[in-house]
Swiss-Prot record:
Positions where N6-(pyridoxal phosphate)lysine occurs in the chain: 283
Enzyme Commission number(s): 2.6.-.-
NCBIfam families, per the entry: PRK07678.1
GO BP terms in the entry: biotin biosynthetic process; glycerol metabolic process
Lineage, opening ranks: Bacteria, Bacillati, Bacillota, Bacilli, Bacillales
Top-level EC class as recorded in UniProt: transferase
Gene: yhxA
Protein name: Uncharacterized aminotransferase YhxA
GO MF annotation: an example: adenosylmethionine-8-amino-7-oxononanoate transaminase activity
Length: 450
């Protein structure tokens, strides 16, 4: 810890008091005073106002993909702010055009891009596009969406309705109509699913039971992230795509967390050989240096909106979505990922980190260690044979022990009652070998506290 003078200590204490008084840290409940107040950051490390350094093994909220302190991103935004600080996409500007083109390169297809600010907004946009698309194609009954239990898709009403986490919905219901849920794929708790693909078959049955003609689409993350890093069978997503095609539904892929290299591919769906109709993205698009999200739609969907009737157009406006500075910064962010081969680095470092954490399987409370790229989950259980989930208190002990040792890790809190039992790791791609060793050492030591 850096030395602090008495004046700095007093200023810091005052800052903590004001933080507790004025800033609502909703997920912390009654424990507002426990907040780490970040002051500066570089690479994978964050320094708080007490001068203490922490390795951020969650990239903020799964989003600072290229790491902290990249001055090139700040400079890209600054130069754009000087030239054109704002213009709405009711018209256009060069950074948005260039970024949309670049995203098409990354997606490997012919997509048209709608810009917003957050993952929740990107998913809300996708729902509206899908419903109107079917209407304009003459399918007037298609309004329902299928998602999976344990998945998270956002905190706005539509995105929360798609979310399969009851603890995130409780006290905010009733939510939007037309959202259905299927059991999630989870090869740890249901290893037979790798052969039977029963979790995909359930989506097929739901479409039949609900009447195919009423299903607008299926929304899914390639890997369920916030719900516990649930790994699907290899053939799962491809089968769901085939089911969607057979029933006339759209496949919407939520890449808000899995996208931009997090799983070791540009986008998570690329592991599974599918071509989604709609793709939503946020977080890593700017490495969180500025708010930006996008909803990418296949060109044939976009073409359905080109009619001349008064309500044929997509009547959806976003004031700040696709701001010039955010788009310019995103372009620089993607350029850095390309130039420094950070997606390959995510793949390689992720494989090494996952491999070194496998030793935790010997711990009596660890049931599974899993992941892809720099997206890793460690599931805690009471009993390895029955796989009964561990209490959240055990998870909290490990998280607290890591923080005390200078490591920030995540957990799947407030999701499904009884299943908040997964430690989560999603460090920045700029992680050094020394950083990786620190994560492994600290996590292993912290498990010795339970």
């Amino acid at each position: 810890m850096e030395m602090m003078g008495m004046e700095n200590i007093q200023q810091n204490q005052g800052l903590k008091q004001k933080d507790e008084q004025f800033v609502w840290h909703a997920m912390k409940g009654a424990h507002q005073a426990d907040s780490l107040i970040a002051q500066k950051a570089e690479g994978a490390w964050v320094t708080d106002t007490d001068g203490r350094r922490y390795l951020d093994a969650m990239s903020g909220l799964w989003c600072v993909n290229i790491g902290y302190g990249r001055k090139e991103l700040a400079e890209a935004a600054y130069e754009q702010l000087k030239e054109l600080p704002y213009y709405p996409l009711t018209q256009s500007h060069a950074p948005a055009i260039q970024l949309a083109e670049k995203l098409n390169e990354w997606l490997g297809g012919d997509y048209v891009i709608f810009f917003s600010n957050s993952g929740s907004e990107a998913n809300e946009t996708a729902f509206k596009i899908a419903r109107q698309y079917h209407l304009q194609n003459g399918d007037h009954s298609r309004y329902k969406f299928i998602s999976r239990y344990r998945a998270y898709h956002g905190n706005t009403l539509g995105a929360l309705s798609a979310t399969g986490q009851a603890q995130r919905k409780y006290k905010y219901e009733p939510l939007s109509q037309g959202f259905l849920h299927a059991a999630p794929p989870d090869i740890y708790r249901n290893p037979d699913d790798a052969d039977t693909l029963e979790s995909a078959n359930e989506i097929d049955r739901i479409m039949t039971w609900e009447l195919s003609e009423t299903i607008a689409g299926v929304i899914m993350e390639p890997i369920i992230t916030g719900g516990g890093i649930l790994m699907p069978p290899d053939g799962y997503m491809k089968k769901v795509e085939d089911i969607c095609r057979r029933h006339g539904a759209l496949l919407i892929c939520d890449e808000v967390i899995c996208g931009f290299g997090r799983t070791g591919e540009p986008f998570g769906f690329m592991h599974y050989g599918v071509k989604p109709d709609i793709i939503t993205m946020a977080k890593g698009i700017t490495s969180a240096y500025l708010p930006l999200s996008a909803t990418a739609v296949k060109r044939d969907i976009f073409e359905a909106y080109q009619g001349e009737a008064p309500y044929d157009r997509f009547r959806h406006v976003n004031t700040f979505g696709g701001s010039p500075a955010a788009c310019a910064l995103a372009l620089k962010n993607l350029q850095i990922m390309e130039d420094e081969q950070l997606i390959q680095r995510s793949r390689d470092l992720g494989a090494k980190l996952l491999g070194e954490l496998q030793a935790l399987r010997e711990h009596p409370a660890v049931g599974d260690v899993r992941g892809k790229g720099l997206l890793i989950g460690i599931e805690l259980v009471k009993d390895k044979l029955t796989k009964e989930p561990a209490d959240a208190a055990k998870v909290n002990q490990v998280v607290a022990a890591c923080k005390e040792k200078g490591l920030i890790i995540g957990k799947n809190g407030d999701t499904v009652a009884g299943y908040n039992n997964v430690i989560q790791l999603a460090p920045p791609f700029c992680l050094t070998e020394e950083d990786l060793s620190f994560i492994v050492k600290t996590v292993k030591e912290s498990f010795q506290t339970i």
